[in-house]
């Protein structure tokens, strides 16, 4: 059984960022990924936007926190960010919990920019009661992936990434976790980072921890 300073489950943005963070501090890390390559799921699907909190009108504190991370992400990873387009938000005139006036007030309170536009410029009359030009960007997930893989390659003795991993169980005793995989592998560490995003509850359930109340929705995003 191999022992590590950190076991990271998931090779998306959070997983590889964490692995690089640990390697730079001299720690021995293994990343376990179920897919055949990194950045195959949420990190790739969510590249449609580097969001600034506009979709959190129910929580100003969350929006403000998102805005702070928006600035940090664009500073740290400017090499993969595309800013050359308009990002338009609209509030529906029907069946919406937020209207145009509320959205505008929310943006002002959260200190995030929005420019009010005429709804008829983008939508049929009566469909939307508010349309706004905002400041959000997209990023190229493949460029970002290549960056992390190149940086991690500088630490061949500190990091190991295993692909196609099927985690079957996780044992926990007083001071360590043991992750068991379908191929008979066993990996031990006092620290396990669950960076699986949509698979978070599957991992929590294996350890016997309380699961999050997550609602899953099937989404399709077109980035042009």
Language-model features and meaning:
Residues 39, 185-224:
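Central helical "cap/lid" subdomain
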Residues 132-191, 195-202:
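Helical element adjacent to the flavin cofactor pocket in flavoenzyme catalytic cores
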Residues 1-14, 30:
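Beta1/beta-strand and adjacent pyrophosphate-binding region of the FAD-binding site
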Residues 27-29, 114, 192:
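Hydrophobic anchor at the start of a short beta-strand
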Residues 23-44:
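Glycine-rich FAD pyrophosphate-binding loop
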Residues 47-122, 127-130:
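Dinucleotide-binding Rossmann-like beta1-alpha1 core, especially the glycine-rich loop
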